[in-house]
Amino acid sequence: MDNKTIFITGAASGIGKATALLFHTQGWIVGACDASQDALDVLSNELTERCPTYCVDVRNSSQLEAAIADFCRQSSGRLDIMFNNAGIAIGGHFEDLPMQKTRDMVDINLVGVLNGFHASIPYLKNTDGALCISTSSSAAIYGAAGMATYTATKYAIKGFTHAMSVELSRFGIRVADVMPGIIDTPLWAGARYKDGEVAGTYEKIPKLNADLTDERRTISPTEVAKAVWSAYHGDRLHWYVPEELERSDKATSADYQKRRDELLNARK
């Protein structure tokens, strides 16, 4: 049997790297795409085979398309998983952030996903049981004050996942997203917002259900990588990490006003 293939954006650190390592240990061929050549070199030293690397900015559709085409050319056009994972988070009150930083988040987090979908669909169509999965966030559940633009991009990914899961079903392509909580990764380390008014908000929010004890714990990238593995072998639209977030998502969807009031009260 031929090796299965996965192409990962944002592959050289955090969730992307953990996913690359996990799938590689399972015998998959991993296409590792990242904007940092230095980080890719480190990954290449860890995965000495079956891991071609591509230094690409996902905002550049032509670069990303060329990288995916080169990767799939090596596998006779096969692509089992496209993992749109690249993203950045910049914290701060919306009015305080330079618009260039806001645009960077939109272009990397959202437009990068659109570019990944568009470039990978021809190869996913050529592969039985293929999956296109993207990294959304628990921010698409709560609406993270102090990270409004990041929240918007993750809500957009969630909605895009819904739409594309229907649109691509005619080709037999599965579509999903992974929705992690707070993760111990470089992305979040660089996004922490020091303003006490914002930073303390989420620690104060009453839990929707008393038994959701793990809802706000810090998550390891490996946990999210395992969810991506499960997504390939499962058939769900959203993969929550931890799973308790699913119940919060359903409760929030049922009553957005109640959730907003909880957030506002927590900041008093």
Spell out what each predicted region is:
Residues 12-13:
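Conserved glycine-rich cofactor-binding loop
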Residues 56-66, 99:
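The beta1-alpha1 cofactor-binding region of Rossmann-like NAD(H)/NADP(H)-dependent oxidoreductases
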Residues 93-94, 98-106:
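Substrate-binding pocket helix/loop in short-chain dehydrogenase/reductase
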Residues 117, 153:
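Active-site helix of classical SDR
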Residues 122, 166-169:
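Alpha-helical segment proximal to the catalytic Tyr-Lys
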Residues 137:
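Residue(s) in the substrate-gating loop at a strand-loop-helix junction
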Residues 170-240:
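SDR active-site lid
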